[in-house]
Design a protein with these regions (language model features):
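Short internal beta-strands
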Residues: 1-3
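Structured adenosyl-cofactor binding patch, chiefly the S-adenosyl-L-methionine
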Residues: 81-120, 124-130
Length: 141
């Protein structure tokens, strides 16, 4: 896609404020990068697509002991993506939101994201509350 510095700035800002191990960057040639990663064998490539195998069947086989690249499919995903991916996984076989597919996949693969320890190091901490907003601001040291 096209480079959008504002998207990267937003994601990096959210990570800085709320914590957690998240990184992002613009890749000018994503298919070349995916090919290199596929050939290296050092990462697992997971392609989320409505044409893949059911997520409940695929997830137990996806290794957790090496980095993963999750490609969220859409109408413009090159056909080659299906061939270089280690797993083509569907969250449903009907059109659906790519963000929803990613959320379902990540929750099932890495587990619940609502544990406070998953997002340490942030300036802001949201405390679960049945009513209203409870936020703790951590002062920088």
């Amino acid at each position: 896609g096209e480079e959008d510095p504002s998207a990267l700035e937003t994601w990096n800002s959210v990570t800085e404020r709320f914590g957690g191990p998240f990184g992002c960057r613009y890749e000018p040639s994503p298919m070349s990068w995916l090919r290199r990663e596929s050939k290296s064998g050092q990462t697992t490539i997971v392609h989320l697509t409505m044409y893949g195998e059911p997520w409940r069947e695929a997830i137990p086989r996806i290794p957790m002991d090496k980095p993963a690249i999750v490609v969220v499919g859409g109408t413009k995903v090159p056909a080659e993506t299906y061939h270089i991916s280690d797993f083509n996984v569907s969250v449903g076989n009907q059109p659906h939101s790519e963000v929803a597919a990613l959320a379902v996949f990540l929750d099932a693969w890495v587990g619940s994201m609502d544990e406070p320890s998953r997002f340490s190091g942030g300036q802001i901490e949201v405390v679960p509350s049945p009513r209203g907003k409870v936020v703790i601001t951590h002062e920088e040291e």
